[in-house]
Amino acid sequence: MRLIIRTNYNDISKWAANHVAMRIKEFSPTKEKPFILGLPTGSSPIGMYKNLIEMNKIGKISFENVVTFNMDEYVGLDKNHPESYNSFMWNNFFSHIDIKKENVHMLNGNAINLTNECTEYENKIKSYGGIMLFVGGIGPDGHIAFNEPGSSLKSRTRLKTLTQDTIIANSRFFENDINKVPKSALTVGVGTIMDSKEVMIIVNGHNKARALRHAIEKGVNHMWTISTLQLHKNAIIVSDEAATYELKVGTVKYFNDIEKDNFNNDI
C-alpha cells in the first residue's frame, strides 16, 4: 500500500486529480473500450473534482469515453433532492465536464425492489469488466462509502442501516435536524471496492488521524473498514499532514522517503 503525504487539502486534491487524469490518459479509452471509474461524494473529493473540471476545460483530460459508478445513495430521498448524492454529483462534477449522461451510473434509492437494484448494480459493473480505479474518502471511524464499522470485508452492494453517529454527522446537510436524515442507504460493499484494479482513498483533517493510523500501522480489522486496503495489491492513500498526526515519526519518514519522487505528478 502506498501513502502519499502532502501539506494540505489543496495539495492532496491536486495530486488525486492528476492521478485520475493520468490513469485515464494512460488507458487511452475509446467508445468500445471505456475507462471505468468509481467515484465518491462528500467533502473529501470536492477539491479533486474542481481540479478535474479545470483540467477538462483546458483540454488536459476528456471524460467522453469514461464510465462512472458511484459508491452510494440514500434510500427514500428523491434523486433531485438537493442532498441526494445524485444531485451532489451533477452539481459538483458531471454537469461541468464532457461526460455522456448514459455513462453515469448511480444507485437508485427509490427502486421498488432495493435488493434487485443492488444485484443489478453489481452485474452492471461486472459487464464492463470491473472498475479500474475506485476513488473514495473515509469517515472519522474509517468507514468507506456506507460500510460502517463491523461491515463484512467481503460484502457486496447492499442496503445498509446507518449508525446514529453517521446520522448525526450528516445532519449538518439537513438543517441540523437528525429527523430529516435518511436512516438507510444503498452502498457498494467492501468486496466491491476491493475487486477494483486500483483504489485511491483521500484522507484529510486531524479528525481522520486515528483512522489513518489503523489503516497504516494496525492490522486488518472489520471495525476499521479502511484497514482492508492492506490486502489490496494496488491501493493508494493520499493524505494531508493533519491526518498523519497519530502516525509514528518513523512511519511518516518511511513513506516520504519512498514516495519523494512521486510528489509532483503534474500531467
UniProtKB/Swiss-Prot annotation:
EC number in record: 3.5.99.6
GO molecular function per UniProt: glucosamine-6-phosphate deaminase activity; identical protein binding
Record keywords: Allosteric enzyme, Carbohydrate metabolism, Hydrolase
Enzyme class (EC, first level): hydrolase
Active-site feature positions: D72, D141, H143, E148
UniProt cross-references to Gene3D superfamilies, sorted A to Z: 3.40.50.1360
Site positions for Part of the allosteric site: S151, R158, K160, T161, Y254
Protein name: Glucosamine-6-phosphate deaminase
Source species taxonomy: Bacteria, Pseudomonadati, Spirochaetota, Spirochaetia, Spirochaetales
